[in-house]
From Swiss-Prot:
Alphabetized UniProt keyword annotations: DNA-directed RNA polymerase, Nucleotidyltransferase, Transcription, Transferase
Gene Ontology terms for molecular function: DNA binding; DNA-directed RNA polymerase activity; ribonucleoside binding
Lineage: Bacteria, Bacillati, Cyanobacteriota, Cyanophyceae, Synechococcales
Species assigned in the record: Prochlorococcus marinus (strain MIT 9215)
HAMAP family: RNApol_bact_RpoB
NCBIfam families (UniProt xref): PRK00405.1, rpoB
Protein name: DNA-directed RNA polymerase subunit beta
Catalyzed reactions: RNA(n) + a ribonucleoside 5'-triphosphate = RNA(n+1) + diphosphate
UniProt-listed InterPro entries: DNA-dir_RNA_pol_bsu_ext_1_sf (IPR042107), DNA-dir_RNA_pol_bsu_external_1 (IPR019462), DNA-dir_RNA_pol_su2 (IPR015712), DNA-dir_RNAP_su2_dom (IPR007120), DNA-dir_RNAP_su2_hyb_sf (IPR037033), RNA_pol_bsu_bac (IPR010243), RNA_pol_bsu_CS (IPR007121), RNA_pol_bsu_protrusion (IPR007644)
Region (Disordered): 1072-1097
Entry's EC annotation: 2.7.7.6
Pfam family, one: RNA_pol_Rpb2_1
Record-level GO BP terms: DNA-templated transcription
Feature: compositional bias, Polar residues: 1077-1091
Length: 1097
């Protein structure tokens, strides 16, 4: 292919940096969040008020990390920096001040790619979307069908406050979902007089009944109100006025216990039209009175008061790394505060220093817990660059402080009109997490308050103004404007052409003339996420299939020789660049040196900049990370240019699969039910060959009987098995290994008990001490093979950190080349997935008029019912592009260039292709897009013309090699004695309830009995059966399954007298099997069923 890419549509301009969310948030944490926490937390004074400890937050500093990123990965360490902060200890009595810099813990740092390295593994902190703090008004129907209203004040942290009305028009308040309290009691407890309240309300007459109700209950003064409040909130404790005062203060007016946060204050001021200063983060009397006033206006249905929609993105905000980490630091500092107070009280006041008071452990533990085990800290999906990028842009409603899968209703998961341009309506998982895990739209960004914004061009009097920067609007601001979609047709000056434009206004669609439009979106791609925007002709696909297409692109395995798609959308290069998989030069200059491991760029000032390439490293998902230079010595490069291709990249663009020749036709039933028929060319030409790197690890531990040893001298092993081991017993790099081969020889000392009786006898006779060790070597698991790529040895002497009890750790990396084979899963970009059912020799594949055999045959029935017609457009556009020898970029949603534009474009391209010399056969106007193929086996043409073309097809990570599994005899579960399940446990296949019904239906009694007893958990029976098979004897009758005995014992433990009885009423002793058996079987065998009948034949 030549590299001239034809641009069918202008590509999305103004694409932001796609990992911005992560980096900006962590930067905010280092510059503000951490300092904020340290400042809020000081001063700490002891219980007598004599000593005060101040943290001077803005003077904190980070030391250089101990290891760089690569070193941290290699050593299984955390890429982290030590935090030091200046502390000032003031003795109030003597006026003495001690200042000291104190170590307060280690903080993991973000790498340039927006990830963290924790214990050698790359992790990503997923963004969380939660309800924004603020005040929310809702309506509910009571059981008589009357509508009541309520208002909730939700803080960032602290107690909820909920006001509600009832049928008698009384106002109540609940604190943290406790019992209802008359609202006026709370007003009086806060020290407000009746007039204070009434003056603030626009309709005091509604409130009058609440005042009377309070008077009727005899609560006339502030003191009585405080007592009543205490009784309701702390029932069972003796009430007191001072107790009530303190309770009220600590619940709502103490900044340490109650915090609306910056966002909460902003939202409350906005909703209730208040002017409380931004730094007042607790509740004020004004907030409470305005909330009551607003609620009364709702109740009386007076204009200006509106209910809130909690699923609107104006009421949900994103918490990114920085804020999640800040919350965790707060938890750690609160634990630290208790320790400091205790140490102040216990220690000698005169000799105390800040370093003695501050113990870094609680803070370190809190941060470690967050990165190691929080639901939002995830092992990075590194299958390919797109998977990595999408993972960093993921937005989850789950996690601490969020929703749970079980409780999340339909409304939360649904697409909301305010998602437009902010969250992708397509990319979300299938299954229980659908709608709870979303992806950020391509142009969206998160503002300082955590609300998602999306950009627009202003429209002045029907003319789109593209001068300067676009305007970013959050969801609640956008609701007030009339916004036109990004694919509106304009003339060269930017005037909107159509007479009526569909716009979104207040979450509704309406049509307005151009001069009424306020804003227009930047680009049609702005609505969808990065993965979805890589699907060409997306607008012709059903949303369910587009969802599968988006999700499956993330599972594509990087191939040996990646190939850019013939038909792309123009975002491929941006995805590759922002994923961090390709090295980029930061300076203008000339390439002065290139080899496989490094690239050197000399800038205009003569300074050299080194770029080191990754070679054959293992990713988190066992795929291969490898970078190949694409610049030559002497090339002139500009800042931001790609220097090398990463995995699944070609020419600086993302290339997840291969462009292959596809025909849509049935072929001998081999593509029934989405199966795929492929040509042998895919195997021989390594089109879909990928490299996978497996890591095997073994540690030599200290045991009770002495240390384990890594050695070549393994008992009872032939010399040829040790051929590839060095003198230490470790495999050599480059050796080819198969399943069962030794990678690292290890022997473990064995105790007296481990010896068989004959050995003990020999010992007793000869008195000779044999070498008491047993073979415990690391071997290649079943079904695996490959070439040893690297061996790493870690010992305490070298200063490596090893797990407790280990003296030495050896790691062996084995690489395999996996060619495509029957059972592998493949997919296109439009959700058209299938399993390979047969690999045909290329001479048997159907072939084109010019003799080219096709690569893949797909079933045409996969298209109509699934409604993903985009694949057909891609097929034909790819066919035209390959014949024109170019590549095409098609931006989705192309109706702005005219109706039916995709159709016309594809047709024009095909006609253009057929005008090339000798290519007239490429396009047949009578049967557009189809060709008459011939059968490779007979040479006869098929009955009907067939749609043929080039499509981008991916090989997915669900490889048959990782899934195929067989078991003969293996481990059993301890309690039920049934075989374990799963490949990792060497397990069996479950014969479930429905399978039992199937066998019962056919009356296959003996087969069924065998499956439920000797092949599963009849311990005695299975040993006898094995014995009988080995000796060629008939298999004895099965006994009682172990799980049945367990069931009996469980019922007996409930106190039920339960037993098994024969027809004669004699109890059967289920435990008799345990006695050592006599040689004569106590049960009849199959012989007694009369084998003579069979022998006569």
């Amino acid at each position: 292919m030549s590299s001239s890419a034809l641009q069918v549509a202008k590509t999305a301009t103004y694409l932001p940096d796609l990992v911005e969310v992560q980096r900006a948030s962590f930067k905010w944490f280092l510059e503000q969040g951490l300092i904020e926490e340290l400042q809020n937390f000081s001063p700490i004074s002891d219980y007598t008020g004599k000593l005060e400890l101040h943290f001077i937050g803005e003077e904190y500093r980070l030391k250089r990390p101990r290891h760089d990123v690569e070193e941290a990965k290699r050593r299984d360490a955390t890429f982290a920096s030590q935090m030091y902060v200046t502390c000032r200890l003031i003795n109030k009595e003597t006026g003495e001040i001690k200042e000291q810099e104190v170590f307060i813990g280690e903080l993991p740092l973000m790498t340039e790619r927006g990830t963290f390295i924790i214990n050698g593994a790359e992790r990503v902190i997923v963004n969380q979307i939660v309800r924004s703090p603020g005040v929310y008004f809702k309506d509910e129907l009571d059981k008589n069908g009357r509508r009541t209203y309520n208002a909730s004040v939700i803080p960032n942290r602290g107690a909820w406050l909920k006001f509600e009305t009832d049928k008698n028009n009384l106002l109540y308040v609940r604190v943290d979902k406790t019992r209802k309290i008359n609202a006026h009691v709370l007003m009086r407890a806060m020290g407000l007089s009746d007039n204070d309240v009434v003056d603030k309300l626009r309709h005091p007459e509604f409130y009058q009944s609440s005042i009377e109700s309070a008077n009727d209950e005899g609560i006339n003064s502030e003191d009585q109100a405080l007592l009543e409040l205490y009784k309701k909130l702390r029932p069972g404790e003796p009430p007191s006025v001072s107790g009530g005062q303190q309770l009220l203060h600590s619940r709502f007016f103490d900044p340490k216990r109650y915090d609306l946060g910056r966002v909460g204050r902003y939202k409350i001021n906005k909703k209730l039209r208040l002017t409380v200063p931004d730094d007042v983060r607790t509740l004020t009397h004004e907030d409470v009175l305005s909330t009551i006033d607003y609620l009364i206006n709702l109740e009386l249905d007076i204009g200006g008061a509106s209910l809130d929609d909690i699923d609107h993105l104006g009421n949900r905000r994103v918490r990114s790394v920085g804020e999640l980490l800040q919350n965790q630091v707060r938890v750690g500092l609160n634990r630290l505060e208790r320790i400091i107070k205790e140490r102040m009280t216990v220690g000698e006041t005169d000799s105390l220093t800040p370093a003695q008071l501050v113990n870094p452990k609680p803070l370190v533990a809190a941060i470690k817990e967050f990165f190691g085990s929080s639901q939002l800290s995830q092992f990075m999906d590194q299958t390919n660059p797109l998977a990595e990028l999408t993972h960093k842009r993921r937005i989850s409603a789950l996690g601490p402080g969020g929703l749970t899968r079980e409780r999340a209703g339909f409304a939360v998961r649904d697409i909301h009109p305010s998602h437009y341009g902010r969250l992708c309506p397509i990319e979300t998982p299938e299954g229980p997490n659908a709608g709870l895990i979303n992806s950020l739209a391509t142009h969206a960004r998160v503002n300082e308050y955590g609300f998602i914004e999306t950009p627009f061009w202003e429209v002045n009097n029907g003319k789109v103004d593209k001068e300067g920067n676009p305007v970013y609007l959050s969801a609640d601001l956008e609701d007030e404007c009339r916004v036109a979609p990004g694919d509106v047709a304009t003339d060269k000056e930017g005037n909107i052409i159509a007479n009526l434009i569909p716009v979104r206004y207040r979450q509704d669609f309406e049509k307005v003339p151009p001069h009424q439009v306020d804003y227009v979106q930047l680009s049609p791609v702005q609505v969808i996420s990065v993965a979805t925007s890589l699907i060409p002709f997306l607008e012709h696909d059903d949303a369910n299939r587009a969802l599968m297409g988006s999700n499956m692109q993330r599972q594509a395995v990087p191939l040996l020789r990646p190939e850019r798609p013939l038909v792309g959308t123009g975002l491929e290069s941006q995805v590759a660049r922002d994923s961090g998989m390709v090295p980029i030069t930061k300076v203008n200059g000339i390439v002065s040196y290139v080899d496989a491991n490094e690239i050197v760029v000399k800038d205009d000032h003569g300074n050299e900049h080194f770029h080191y390439l990754q070679k054959y490293q293992r990713s988190n998902q066992d795929t291969c990370l490898n970078q190949r230079p694409i610049v030559k010595i002497g090339d002139r490069v500009i800042s931001g240019q790609v220097l090398a291709d990463g995995s699944a990249c070609e020419g600086g663009e993302i290339a997840l699969g291969q462009n292959v020749l596809i025909a849509y036709m049935p072929w001998e039933g081999y593509n029934y039910e989405d199966a795929i028929l492929v040509s042998e060319r895919m195997v021989t030409d390594d089109l879909y060959t990928s490299v996978h790197i497996e890591k095997y690890e073994i540690e030599a531990r200290q045991t009770k009987l002495g240390p384990e040893e890594i050695t070549r001298e393994i008992p009872n092993i032939s010399e040829e098995s040790l051929n590839n081991l060095d003198e230490m017993g470790i495999i050599r790099i480059g050796a080819f290994v198969e399943s069962g081969d030794i990678l690292v020889g290890k022997v473990t000392p064995k105790g007296e008990s481990d010896q068989p009786p004959e050995e003990k006898l020999l010992r007793a006779i000869f008195g000779e001490k044999a070498r008491d060790v047993r073979d415990n070597s690391l071997r290649v698991p079943k079904t695996e093979k490959g070439r040893v790529l690297d061996v790493r040895i870690y010992t305490r002497e070298q200063g490596d950190e090893l797990p407790p009890g280990a003296n030495m750790v050896v790691r062996v990396y084995v690489a395999q080349r996996r060619k495509i084979q029957v059972g592998d899963k493949m997919a296109g970009r439009h959700g058209n997935k299938g399993i390979i059912s047969r690999i045909l020799p290329r001479e048997d594949m159907p072939y084109l008029p010019d003799g080219t055999p096709v690569d893949i045959v797909l079933n045409p029935l996969g298209v109509p019912s699934r409604m993903n017609v985009g694949q057909v457009f891609e097929l034909l556009m790819g066919w035209a592009a390959s014949n024109l020898n170019c590549r095409v970029k098609v931006v989705p949603f192309d109706e702005m260039y005219g109706a039916e534009k995709s159709h016309q474009t594809v047709q024009a391209f095909l006609e253009e292709a057929s005008k090339q010399p000798g290519k007239a056969w490429v396009y047949n106007p009578d049967d557009p897009g189809k060709l008459l193929l011939k059968d490779g086996r007979t040479g006869e043409p098929f009955d009907q013309p067939v749609a043929v073309g080039y499509s981008h097809f991916l090989k997915l990570v669900h490889l048959v090699d990782d899934k195929i599994h067989a078991r003969s005899t293996g481990p059993y579960s301890l309690v039920t004695q049934q075989p374990l399940g799963g490949k990792a446990q060497q397990g069996g296949q479950r014969l479930g309830e429905m399978e039992v019904w199937a066998l019962e239906a056919y009356g296959a009694a003996y087969t069924l009995q065998e499956l439920l007893t000797v092949k599963s958990d009849d311990m005695q029976g299975r040993n006898e059966a094995l014995n009988a098979i080995v000796k060629g004897k008939p298999i004895p009758r099965p006994g009682t399954p172990e799980s049945f005995k367990v069931l009996m014992r469980e019922l007996q433990s409930l106190g039920l007298d339960i037993g098994v009885y024969t027809d004669e009423g004699k109890e059967v002793d289920l435990m008799q099997d345990i006695n050592p058996r006599r040689n004569t079987p106590s049960r009849p065998t199959y012989e007694s069923l009369g084998t003579s009948e069979y022998e006569e034949d």
